[in-house]
Amino acid sequence: MKALDELIFDNRFARLGDAFSTSVLSEPIETPRLVVASQSALALLDLAPEQADLPLFAEIFSGHKLWSEAEPRAMVYSGHQFGSYNPRLGDGRGLLLGEAYNDAGEHWDLHLKGAGRTPYSRMGDGRAVLRSSIREFLASEALHALGIPSSRAGCVVSSSTPVWRETQEHAAMVLRLAQSHVRFGSLEYFFYTKQPEQLKTLAEHVLTMHYPHCQEQPEPYLAMFREIVERNAELIAKWQAYGFCHGVMNTDNMSILGITFDFGPFAFLDDFDEHFICNHSDHEGRYSFSNQVPIAQWNLSALAQALTPFISVEALRETIGLFLPLYQAHYLDLMRRRLGLTIAQEQDEQLVSQLLKLMQNSGVDYTLFFRRLGDQPAAEALRTLRDDFVDIKGFDGWAEAYLARIAGEGKGTEQERQTRMHAVNPLYILRNYLAQNAIAAAEKGDYAEVRRLHQVLCTPFTEQPGMEGYAQRPPDWGKHLEISCSS
């Protein structure tokens, strides 16, 4: 394991030149304090755990100090926001400090969010507030623990620096780790500004650095795009299967790697509601829970447009057409596993859709239903869960079909089924009210709850003694919390 001053940098994106990013130094925040750190994320850099306890750690990730090999850059990109094209966005408050590589040869971007003003800040102050930084940290690490591809979060550092949003708050910085920060909107920018050479350079960078195996194919860019489609189909299937709502699926928030990226007004479902909108600015529900699948396909079409100089329109359309069947296959596989089933059958889609309809009509807690279904032998669990449903007759019909489905598989014991289900059905998820409790304490200078919640979320499938309070439905005040893009 390494000390902070032993990180090795190889800043490949910075070497692309000033057309792709701008050299900017961070604006430090005052009296920095470490709020929370993720040892598993920092281990990606081979950093020793005790490094987070050093004063130097908070100084670096609050903008006060910098490695001599780092080359902080603000990246330029554009994007479709709520369906409308915005020609110039870019890192308005974040900096790509550099790319460090570990002993395994993996490159990781170190991106400091809340690092101050850049040429792309427009009218903003370049700051991130403590609450949004904590939310991004917790979401990144919670999704990773659930097995959902995501950028990682190394730490959050707080400060006494005041910033104004709806009220006065305090600035913070969050360290984001990802193997690339290239977005769909990065390629869109060079396509729509008619910079073909720069577009080709960026496309080659993505292909060479992140999809090198595609170079062996007859049409490398088509092979790369197909893999991007495949990765996004699997990603969105996991979002839907685990009840995650992103909230702002603009193309500038879509990673070229097919990972969850740029956390804003996200939420996990409490009660199952396919029409759930987690962003109170999304008045038309464009990014509602049920719309995430078609929006992901729409975003892939937007990316495809930027790739037309390299791939035929016909091939792009054919590849985009693979998204829905790939998504459906991944989603049904995940839902089978959540139900403890091991064999695919034609009626599985109906079994899942009927259950979700019953849950929708009864306001059943999405996460706890699946967990409790695996807590007992199936017949006993169904009798216990029956009281949660308004349509008792409908639920009894579904339960009968489910029991017949289990019996038809004839594989293993009830205990084996329960073990399988507990391995894929979390007991703990990042509910908005849990995040809000942690944020409220942190804003008073108490970081113990943020750290405790982080530790609970790191092992979501394992029951943790004394942590029963983190596996409860939200109290009345915690239901339907409205989260804005203000951060």
From Swiss-Prot:
Top EC group: transferase
Binding site for ATP: 90, 92-93, 113, 125-126, 176, 183, 262
Family: Belongs to the SELO family.
UniProt cross-references to InterPro entries, sorted A to Z: SelO
PANTHER family, A to Z: PROTEIN ADENYLYLTRANSFERASE SELO, MITOCHONDRIAL
Presence of the UniProt keyword Manganese in the record: yes
Gene (UniProt): ydiU
Residue sites binding Mg(2+) per the record: 253, 262
Reaction equations catalysed: L-seryl-[protein] + ATP = 3-O-(5'-adenylyl)-L-seryl-[protein] + diphosphate; L-threonyl-[protein] + ATP = 3-O-(5'-adenylyl)-L-threonyl-[protein] + diphosphate; L-tyrosyl-[protein] + ATP = O-(5'-adenylyl)-L-tyrosyl-[protein] + diphosphate; L-histidyl-[protein] + UTP = N(tele)-(5'-uridylyl)-L-histidyl-[protein] + diphosphate
Pfam families with a match to the protein in the record: SelO
Physiological role: Nucleotidyltransferase involved in the post-translational modification of proteins. It can catalyze the addition of adenosine monophosphate (AMP) or uridine monophosphate (UMP) to a protein, resulting in modifications known as AMPylation and UMPylation.
Organism annotation: Pseudomonas savastanoi pv. phaseolicola (strain 1448A / Race 6)
Keywords: ATP-binding, Magnesium, Manganese, Metal-binding, Nucleotide-binding, Nucleotidyltransferase, Transferase
Protein's recorded name: Protein nucleotidyltransferase YdiU
